[in-house]
Amino acid sequence: MIENVKQTTSEKLLLVLLIILGIIAFYIFVILPQKCLFIKNYNPKEINFKNPKNIAVLNVNCGNIIIKLYPSISPKSVDRFKMLITSGKYDGTSFHRVIKNVLVQSGDLEFGKKNNLDYLYVGTGKSGYGAINSELNDETEFKIGTVGMARTNKLNTEDSQFFILLRDAPLFKGEYTPIGEVVYGLEILNTIKDGYPREYVLRPDFINTFKLLVN
């Protein structure tokens, strides 16, 4: 008769560890990449734009988010935005504040960079170029895909941080500075890691690159 061989404690622990590692590997290499599987990635060079000088391409893990800027509506804010884009300041910056189905926010150049992320202060950082005045109007709608300048609870404190709406926000009209709108890749925004149930994100996603279509 063959007797059952009992597993030692160390063998049981090793088995549990292997199972855990297998689950982690399955998530990283199988589940995680699937969030981009059915997302269309747009190539801006294959699209004809009426005014390509006002097109910005925000690249994240699942592809390109193409933004049409509003220089005629908010000229000073768009100038600041373009300057930060062309100088590469936004590259490697976190989406530090993401409210599921509401908005994504990025642009903290002081405390939100990938190589220097400070969870204690992220969201309060500045660009080093100083604040600019708010450019408010009662005509531009804040709808899904609208890009706006973030600020503190005071006017004229816009700097480098910006947000993109994931749903209509009519109460934002006349309260925030609109600088553009997403024209392609809106669905990609929904793949950016959110902070649910909080607003601020632990181990956030980052901007890979942010470029103007025409410099």
Regions found by a protein language model. Name each.
Residues 1-215:
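Cyclophilin-like peptidyl-prolyl cis-trans isomerases
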